[in-house]
């Protein structure tokens, strides 16, 4: 959600996140704990859950597996950004085509009106949880974790890396894997 950060909102804020995740999970046919919620906006205000869940219903009805839908999502998360930030690539791993896509928003300004950095990276690569976390941690230490605008960071800065393994490539289980990536 954009407009309200849902930070410093106590149990009611947590309940709002859980309601959003439950709504999305039910509509998408996935477990609630498979839904991740990210927020950007004003700190300390409560989220209008009814408005958000109505929006989730519209998004699920309009979802598509197209480049245009991905671009629409990248534009939808923009706040103070002047351009969307998105990329998608395909490569071969172990003779299988693997896709990696990413989008992010922020950070044009932080202080005095904090603006959150949100980053979402998805892949259909088959990779172990350990290697996925290691790749993300190694990447953000020299990128996202070095960003400071006006000497501040946001309460809600988020980077998510998700892999579903549907590419059916040989599983990446070690950093210096013998799998040829071209």
Regions found by a protein language model. Give the residues of each.
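Short, surface-exposed loop/turn segments at secondary-structure boundaries that line and modulate
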Residues: 3-11, 33-52, 148-171
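Glycine-rich anion/phosphate-binding loops
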Residues: 11-19
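Glycine-rich, mobile lid/loop segments that gate access to catalytic sites or pores
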Residues: 18, 23-142, 154
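Conserved small/polar residues in nucleotide/adenosyl-binding loops
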Residues: 179-181
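Short arginine-rich
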Residues: 143-147
């Amino acid at each position: 959600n954009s407009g309200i950060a849902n930070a410093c909102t106590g149990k009611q804020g947590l309940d709002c996140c859980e309601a959003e995740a439950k709504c999305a999970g039910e509509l998408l046919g996935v477990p609630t704990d498979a839904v991740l919620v990210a927020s950007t906006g004003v700190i300390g205000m409560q989220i209008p859950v009814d408005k958000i869940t109505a929006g989730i219903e519209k998004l699920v009805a309009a979802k598509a597996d197209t480049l245009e839908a991905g671009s629409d999502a990248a534009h939808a998360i923009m706040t103070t950004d002047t351009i969307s930030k998105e990329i998608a690539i395909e490569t071969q791993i172990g003779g299988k085509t693997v896709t990696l896509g990413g989008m992010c928003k922020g950070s044009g300004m932080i202080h005095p009106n904090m603006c959150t950095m949100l980053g979402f990276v998805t892949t259909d690569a088959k990779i172990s949880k350990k290697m996925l976390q290691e790749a993300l941690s190694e990447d953000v230490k020299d990128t996202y974790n070095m960003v400071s605008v006006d000497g501040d960071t946001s309460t809600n800065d988020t980077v998510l890396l998700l892999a579903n393994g549907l590419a059916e490539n040989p599983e990446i289980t070690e950093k210096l894997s013998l799998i040829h990536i071209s």
